[in-house]
From Swiss-Prot:
Gene3D superfamilies: 3.30.420.40, Exopolyphosphatase. Domain 2, Hypothetical protein af1432. Pathway: Purine metabolism; ppGpp biosynthesis; ppGpp from GTP: step 2/2. The keyword NADP does not apply. The keyword Protein biosynthesis does not apply. This is Guanosine-5'-triphosphate,3'-diphosphate pyrophosphatase. It comes from Photobacterium profundum (strain SS9). Transmembrane segments: none annotated. Signal peptide: none annotated. Catalyzes the conversion of pppGpp to ppGpp. Guanosine pentaphosphate (pppGpp) is a cytoplasmic signaling molecule which together with ppGpp controls the 'stringent response', an adaptive process that allows bacteria to respond to amino acid starvation, resulting in the coordinated regulation of numerous cellular activities. GO terms for molecular function: guanosine-5'-triphosphate,3'-diphosphate diphosphatase activity. HAMAP family: GppA. Its EC number is 3.6.1.40. Belongs to the GppA/Ppx family. GppA subfamily. InterPro entries: ATPase_NBD, GppA/Ppx_hydrolase, Guo-5TP_3DP_PyrP, Ppx_GppA_C, Ppx_GppA_N, PyroPPase_GppA_Ppx.
């Protein structure tokens, strides 16, 4: 029986070569709300023998996992459930045995999709959850295959599925569990040989940004952040991770700061493949994608969710969900952008800084949905703990810290990796000024102003008559000038006739 016909449930199940995943969601305010996420390490690909036959033990691990999933599918109509099998099931010559029993357990057919179709769905998952509209290269390292895609917006122009994966490479090149240079070299060279046929095509097509959509990339980002690095993955950082891994003799001893026990087993093999991809395609840098296969499955079932700008869809959804005053947010945004335009020539902030200021202004009152007095603290907590498709982890963290400080007491921003410390402080200053200038919430009462800038010194000039007619705003601006100046960010308030 369906409890909520207005907001139906959807389920996406990914029978991966390393892990089985189930994701149950519903649509809320134009965005996807997660209701359940279940993951089990089945390592199906590890059960393939030299004749590509799945062992009884591996199949049983899979069936046991599906029995757990089945309980949660009972109340979701079959047309809103999609179950996909990937590389291990494509490869297994006896997959029909596994699939027949899987259908009996789940009550729905498992769709074993070709590699190119998997790549296409992965790209849709990335496109719906990652910010920016640049031409992008997407790399997803799975248990038994690696998908490499080039696309722009929601359209992919090149789709490839390579028969290299972190589980199969583990069993082939780290079978003895030794983390030696010889094992790493063999794994990297073999992956390069598999990638070589697509190098010319992908190099000619080109890309502007690169994102990784896999557990390997997520593990790398967790390690880098734990070790005080930013979230941008580069070849030099990958080599550094390889050197750290090789300090341990055996895989069972691997204890890199930031690497979870759950990810450790397939980390060296996944790392080897990623190094090969970077070197073969001359990738300069990579960031973590917001989603991949499961997200693509869900967004294709929810076709109405398609939006040309993922981040704008996210901001609109959060505003609706928390019933924020969008008219006021728009007025504060216009003021913040006007302030920023006065600083452009001197500060030359990157486009990302401008967009993070915009996002922060759009959401600056989110904390008041809980309580006004500590609204900054509540805002920071909410931003850190809700899904924001299109924004990276570092960007979410910075938005949270900006909103923690959007009014009243002013403290230094903590270390963050979304912007330079100087530029993050600069957009914080403009956010705070915009909020004060709009505090009457009457857009007709906003004053004409001018802002001049010399390095870090700001001079804000307002009409004397307006300051006289708005004494509270005058006091708040004077207090803000003192607070920013005390932080070493000079702010001078002047009057004009």
């Amino acid at each position: 029986m369906e409890r909520n016909p207005i907001s139906p449930l959807y389920a996406a199940i990914d029978l991966g070569s390393n892990s089985f995943h189930m994701w149950i969601v519903r649509e809320v305010a134009g965005s996807v709300q997660t209701l359940a996420k279940i993951k089990r390490k089945v390592r199906l690909a590890a059960g393939l023998n030299s004749q590509n036959e799945l062992s009884e033990e591996a199949m049983q691990r899979g069936w046991d996992c599906l029995s757990l999933f089945a309980e949660r599918l009972q109340d979701i109509p079959a047309e809103r459930v999609r179950i996909i099998g990937t590389a291990a099931l494509r490869t297994a010559v006896n997959a029909d045995i596994f699939l027949s029993k899987a259908k009996d357990i789940l009550g729905s057919k498992v769709d074993v999709i070709p590699g190119e179709e998997e790549a296409r769905i992965i790209y849709q998952g990335v496109a719906h959850t990652s910010g920016g509209s640049d031409k992008r290269l997407v790399v997803d390292i799975g248990g038994a295959s690696t998908e490499v895609i080039i696309g722009e917006g929601f359209d992919a122009s090149a789709l490839t599925s390579l028969k290299i994966g972190c589980v199969t490479w583990l069993e082939r090149y780290f079978k003895d569990r030794y983390l030696t240079a010889e094992n790493f070299d063999a794994a990297i060279d073999a992956a390069k040989n598999a990638i070589e046929p697509i190098v010319e095509q992908y190099t000619q097509l080109g890309w502007e940004t690169c994102v990784g959509a896999s557990g390997t990339v997520q593990a790398l980002q967790e390690i880098m952040l734990a070790q005080g690095m930013d979230e941008i993955i580069t070849l030099s950082k990958l080599k550094r991770m390889q050197r750290q891994a090789m300090q341990y003799e055996r895989l069972e001893d691997l204890d890199i700061e930031g690497l979870t026990l759950e990810r450790a087993l397939v980390f060296p093999s996944g790392l080897s493949i990623l190094i090969a991809v970077f070197e073969s395609l001359n990738i300069e840098s990579m960031t973590l994608a917001g989603g991949a296969l499961r997200e693509g499955m869900v967004y294709e079932m929810m076709s109405k969710m398609r939006h040309h700008d993922v981040r704008e869809r996210t901001l609109t959804s959060v505003q609706e969900r928390f019933q924020l005053d969008t008219s006021h947010a728009s007025a504060v945004t216009n003021t913040a952008m006007a302030l920023l335009s006065r600083c452009d020539e001197e500060w030359q902030l990157e486009p990302q800084a401008q967009y993070l200021l915009h996002a922060s202004v759009c959401l600056h009152e989110i904390g008041t949905s809980i309580e006004f007095k500590k609204s900054g603290e509540h805002a920071a907590y909410l931003i850190n703990h809700i899904d924001l498709p299109g924004f990276t982890r570092a960007q979410k963290h910075l938005i949270a810290e900006l909103l923690r400080r959007f009014r009243e007491q002013l403290t230094s921003l903590p270390e963050q990796h979304a912007l330079s410390a100087q530029n993050a402080a600069r957009i914080l200053r403009l956010l705070r000024l915009a909020v004060i200038l709009c505090h009457r919430r009457d857009h007709n009462q906003q004053p004409p102003f001018s802002l001049s800038v010399a390095e870090n010194k700001l001079v804000l000039t307002l009409p004397a008559a307006w300051l006289l007619a708005n004494p509270l705003s005058h006091v708040e601006l004077q207090q803000e000038a003192t607070r920013q100046t005390d932080m070493g960010w000079p702010l001078v308030l002047e009057e004009s006739e």
